[in-house]
């Protein structure tokens, strides 16, 4: 047991409270720090007392950096409202990017009766996914998108110019301190430049085009602290591959991440490393990956401004860098850079000691499998194809790292660049034309071509399983891209690994999974140090008065919250003044029999088969028939109209297909209850007027009662959702117990979208009004 100081009474007497010992630092456990790092002299100092009072008042609405940025782009807020995690807000993002899916979005846009863009300056269109496809059908789609963009006066980038996310960053559309969205899951990339980048779905995009806004629920925010210094031979790709594999229990699923660290630590992560890390926070399960507005970012921005001012960014394709990157704008940006408030609340805190990291490889066929390169090298894994492609790792610096592998080998080969290994095919595609031109100017692009690499146009290509060079059955591939799940880059019978550009190049050169040998482990190294908390050892923590008191307040808040949870009744169903307003046309109560599908991570392909996804005009009856058929072919006959579907955790993960929601509506299921939802499924559900609730307790109770697993089960239980009271009532069979449980509030602005029949109809109604 240890003593902690607690304030008591109006005069703030200090009393001692006996609490259990808590480890100050251990992996995957709380590392909240004890009160003994607040010295009594600090508490007795009159100036400290005044500071203590000011800190109390300033902590009324402390916000994370994510919340601060969202606050800037939230519209229609009540006066004095400070947004926080969990809030449903209407957002008017700084920019929105669509790519090859621009035409389906345009069809939605026109179907709701929209005739002009709300704000053409808000919109950017890029063609990047299927750029190798020269069929007339695809070229016609590309022409339609370009004509539509010209008609509405929006920024347009043609096929071959580069990958949309790279364009958004290099052209300055993703700008520090802004909220930027895209109809693509790797919108997280923009977090590298201190922009909250997050994905939306096509209906959202049509809504923003037409009205300038859509809805968003602010995710829980996780703080990830980097400590130490990234060693030579270790890259940003190794950092994010390690994070995905070492924190592999959905630690940040559906969270917004804020990366932080000391100035020295963050200097060891250059901008291209940050772009890689932010990009793959998507694979880690997060909805955004935000880096701070710091000196590294400022230096990069000023470099872009200088390059643009000198005209060095000019080339065969247009660039807006000279307009968007200017030294006065950058200086103004950093006069008062946005930072998280002291006392901001985070849903969780994790840390990774960069100095203990070595080169890592992801796979095969899963980002949750991360293995030190050294272990895989010992296995002599033959490689058939290598890929230096994608918005993750195909910038000029990445191409330079890959070229250095061959240049180093050339020094041992009489100056002659060696060829890639027999039987290996090596594909390269720059993230954008400016990046390729920079690589050509340095001679790095030519080095890779001389080694035998096959150049592909700037675009997504093999990363998403399109075009030349896909993996065949039985083949092994190593890629610098971001996803390696089975079948992503070709055959489901192939094995795909992910690694840094130098690992890709070294593997292409040797013919087996290997690295260039640039990394040397430090003396005494044993393992990667990571865990919960901020990872700073107490003996290294120097606290001034303000830091100490700020820490104390945070600990008091946590202690009070823990006490409230510990001594509060198990269920507190009704609170005075806590009733939710019900929007006209939205049901006050929803009730039905529970059908239970006892499975976690049911993806959208399990809900609505891919075979039907790209077939137009599928009858509603057919959608109902195939709903959940990839999960359980008996679902169609077991589930009935009006049933309430209860499922496990992370329901609706995977692709962004809207039919995963509309097929359940076709089956006439009004409400889905889960332990948790995949974020994109949640968006599609609300956008298509399918109601959903997250109730982990109900999932646990069903699993307790029905231990013998069935894919789909009629339970005989009933669920009634009281929308006004934000509670559910469960009747466990005719003669079983009845219990109630509080659920998250569904606010009127979201009810309105559902009551109108979905976001498209809501937008149409808004346009007509």
Swiss-Prot record:
Its main location: mitochondrion. One of its GO terms (molecular function) is metal ion binding. GO terms for cellular component: mitochondrial matrix. It is found in: Mitochondrion. [4Fe-4S] cluster binds at residues 391, 460, 463. SUPFAM superfamilies: Aconitase iron-sulfur domain, LeuD/IlvD-like. InterPro entries: Acnase/IPM_dHydase_lsu_aba_1/3, Acoase/IPM_deHydtase_lsu_aba, Aconitase/3IPM_dehydase_swvl, Aconitase_4Fe-4S_BS, Aconitase_4Fe-4S_dom, AconitaseA/IPMdHydase_ssu_swvl, Homoaconitase_mito, Homoaconitase_swivel. Gene3D superfamilies: Aconitase, domain 3, Aconitase, domain 4. Its EC number is 4.2.1.36. Catalyzes the reversible hydration of cis-homoaconitate to (2R,3S)-homoisocitrate, a step in the alpha-aminoadipate pathway for lysine biosynthesis. This is Homoaconitase, mitochondrial. It comes from Aspergillus niger (strain ATCC MYA-4892 / CBS 513.88 / FGSC A1513). The gene is lysA.
